[in-house]
Amino acid sequence: MAVEARKVAVLVNGNARGVSDRVLRLVSQVVSPEHLYVSHSMSEGRALVRKILSSGYDTVLTGGGDGTFSQFITQIKDTVAAANGAGKMPAVGALKLGTGNALAGLLGCSEPTEEGLTSDYWKARYTALTREMRFVEVEGRLAPFAGVGLDARILNDYGFLKDRSRGTALEPYLSGGMGYATAIGALTIPKVSGARLPIVTILNDGAPAWRVGPDGRRVGPLVLKGETLYKGPVMIASVSRLDGFGFHFRLFPFAYVREDRLHLRVASCGVFEILTRIRGIWRGEYFSDTITDFLVDRIIMQSEKPLPMQIGGDGEGYRSFIRYALARDPLQLVDFRTAYADLPVGPAAAARNRGVEPGLLPD
C-alpha cells in the first residue's frame, strides 16, 4: 500500500562487520540524530527497540546485514508481542551496510554512499511501497534463511576473510563474489575434503510438503505430517525465503515458487562435484541426483552429529536437532524498487538544480 510521510527510525548494529566509523559518519550525515539509533550489544538493542516502538515510529530501517536484520526484527516482534495488543508491528526495511546483504538485493537497496543512503531514507519516508513476506522461524528467531552444513561454513569462512583483510591491500579483492569464491576454495573446501558426510533425517512437521524437480514442479507424492522427507548423507541442509545469499549466489532457486512454503535444499555433493560445477551452483542452474529440493512449511531436522549452523548468515555454533517453520505472520517489507527513480534530495539532485549533469559530479 502507498504511504505518505512515514515516521522512520534507523537502527544500526555498531558491531556489524560492514559498519565502520566511516559508515556511521556517513549515516549520521543522512539521518538526523533524533531518528538514528546505534546498538553495540543485544541488551542495548532491546532497549533501543522499546524506545523506538514507544516513540510511535511506523517504519524501522536496520543497518548491518542480514544477521542484523534478523536480530532486530526478532527483538521488535518479541517487544510487540509482550505488549499484549498495545503495540503494532512497524514496516521494516534495510540499509545496505553489512557484509551479507541478500535481503538488500530483494528490496532494491542502494549502495552505501551518501547518494544511495539519502535516496533510500527518502524513499522509505515518502514513496516506497511495502510488500508482505513470511520469514523462516527457528529457535524463536525470524530470519530470511537458516541452515546447517556447507552454507554455514561458507558464510563463516567469508566473514573470517573479511575480518582478516579489513584495512589491508587485499580488502577490495576479498569482498563480494570474489570473497565468497576465495573463502570456498581456500578455507571451506579443505575443511570438508575427505570427511564422511553425517546422516541427517528430516521429518515433515506441518502441512503437506513435496519434492520439486529442476522446473519447480512437484515430483512424487505429497509428504504428510510425521512422514520422512529425507534420510541420508548431508553436505548442506538449509531453508530459505530468499533465492540466495547476495552477490547473485542463488542457492535456493525455488524460494519464490510459493508464498506459503519454504525452499528446503538438501545436498550430498562431494568436493569434486562442487568445484567442477561451482558456476552452475552459484547461478542456481545446477541440478543432480545429489541435490534434493522440497517445498515445506514446518520440519524437524536430526543429525547423527552436531553440524555448523547459521541463522540469517550469522554463525550460531553447532546443532544436531532443529525445528524450522514458516512464520505465521508476514512482515511488511519496505520495497525501494517501487519508489520514484529521481528524488529531490541528495548530491545528484543538488547537481541537477545547479544544472550540472550527475555524471560530472566531482569525486
Which functions belong to the PLM regions below?
Residues V10, L224-K231, F247-D363:
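ATP/nucleoside-binding phosphotransfer catalytic cores, i.e., glycine-rich phosphate-binding loops
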Residues A9-L11, V19-D21, S39, D78, ...:
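Catalytic core of DAGKc-family lipid kinases
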Residues M1-G63, T68-T79, N84-A86, L117-S119, ...:
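ATP/NTP phosphate-donor binding region
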Residues G147, D151, S238-P253, G315:
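Glycine-rich phosphate/pyrophosphate-binding beta-alpha loops
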Residues Q29-H35, S54-G56, E139-G140, K305, ...:
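Short glycine/proline-enriched coil/turn segments at helix->beta-strand junctions
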Residues G65-T68, T74, L97-G100, V148-D151, ...:
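Short glycine-rich anion-binding loops that position phosphate/pyrophosphate groups of nucleotides
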